A protein has these predicted regions:
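Vicinal oxygen chelate
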Residues: 42-44, 101-146, 153-154
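Short, well-ordered beta-strand micro-motif
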Residues: 76, 87, 138-140
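N-terminal beta-strand motif that seeds the catalytic metal site of vicinal oxygen chelate
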Residues: 2-44, 103-106, 110, 159-163
């Protein structure tokens, strides 16, 4: 790796700050992080670790709507924040097994009116959806991270209370 031009890096950082960091900002369109979803290779082992070892209460277990037989389960991280997991029984991950324990997606809660407006903005920007259900849109950010905009209140999932 070659030497970094730290002066140029700092100048670029300052240019971006000047262009985008405003002294007075509007309120965010988001209500908060609904949940961050990780992958689990063993549901019970994951529950024993996060609830038993770390003290994060298990709040709900439901079937993953996107993969029949998969469990979607949630832990309370406090302040309305959820940590979620998926398992994918029967799915041969093969060379992708290393993603176990990795990020599946980041779910951001927005109200339904804002959700529709953000959907229009995604459409206008030419962003392709990985999935869309009428209250949930999955898409990739510019670096490939999977993001979900979810028109569900914090602590609810598919109309069920999960917190």
């Amino acid at each position: 790796m070659g030497a970094m031009d730290l002066t140029a890096i700092e100048a670029e950082r300052q240019r971006i700050r000047d262009a985008h960091l405003k002294p007075e900002r509007p309120a965010s369109t988001a209500r908060g992080v609904h949940h961050v979803a990780l992958l689990s290779s063993d549901v019970e082992r994951t529950v024993r670790f996060y609830q038993g070892v770390l003290g994060f209460p298990l709040t709900e277990m439901i079937e993953n709507r996107d993969y029949q037989g998969s469990t979607h389960f949630f832990f309370d991280l406090g302040n309305g924040n959820l940590l979620a997991f998926f398992d994918f029984p029967g799915l041969d991950l093969g060379p992708y097994a290393e993603v176990l324990g990795g990020l599946h997606h980041l779910a951001i809660s927005v109200d339904p009116v804002t959700w529709r407006g953000l959907r229009e903005r995604l459409d206008a920007a030419g962003v392709e959806y990985a999935e869309e259900s009428g209250s949930s849109i999955y898409f990739r950010d510019p670096d490939g991270a999977r993001v979900e905009l979810l028109a569900e209140p914090l602590g609810e999932m598919y109309g069920s209370t999960v917190l």
